[in-house]
């Protein structure tokens, strides 16, 4: 029997549970914003960093396909969430919180990309997997 789907499902359960936990731990007030989806923002930035790091290791075949499916597809797929990002942005716009919405979109995209790049760089240069 092929356990690929079970690995992805198990990882997804772990990742989504972690996302829920992080979301509950984060305050809704952030910097000068009264309402900011800090939980979703945080998991997406953390997830970008981790996927950059693990993505490099996957390309270099440091771990097997099953672990990649479990961790990258499952855990990180469940942990990060583009759909919640879109919903959080829409809610900010509906409440006329335009500065928060713009800050959230720009911050998520810019810091997300930087997180991926830093994760990749660290995996490549400090783990010794070239």
Swiss-Prot record:
The keyword Ion transport applies. One of its GO terms (biological process) is cellular detoxification of fluoride. It is a multi-pass membrane protein. One of its GO terms (molecular function) is metal ion binding. Na(+) is not transported, but it plays an essential structural role and its presence is essential for fluoride channel function. Disulfide bonds: none annotated. InterPro entries: FluC. Na(+) binds at residues 77, 80. The chain crosses the membrane at residues 3-23, 39-59, 67-87, 102-122. GO terms for cellular component: plasma membrane. It comes from the Bacteria. Pfam families: CRCB (PF02537). It catalyses: fluoride(in) = fluoride(out). PANTHER family: FLUORIDE EXPORT PROTEIN 1-RELATED (PTHR28259), FLUORIDE-SPECIFIC ION CHANNEL FLUC (PTHR28259:SF18). HAMAP family: FluC. Fluoride-specific ion channel. Important for reducing fluoride concentration in the cell, thus reducing its toxicity. Belongs to the fluoride channel Fluc/FEX (TC 1.A.43) family. This is Fluoride-specific ion channel FluC. The gene is fluC.
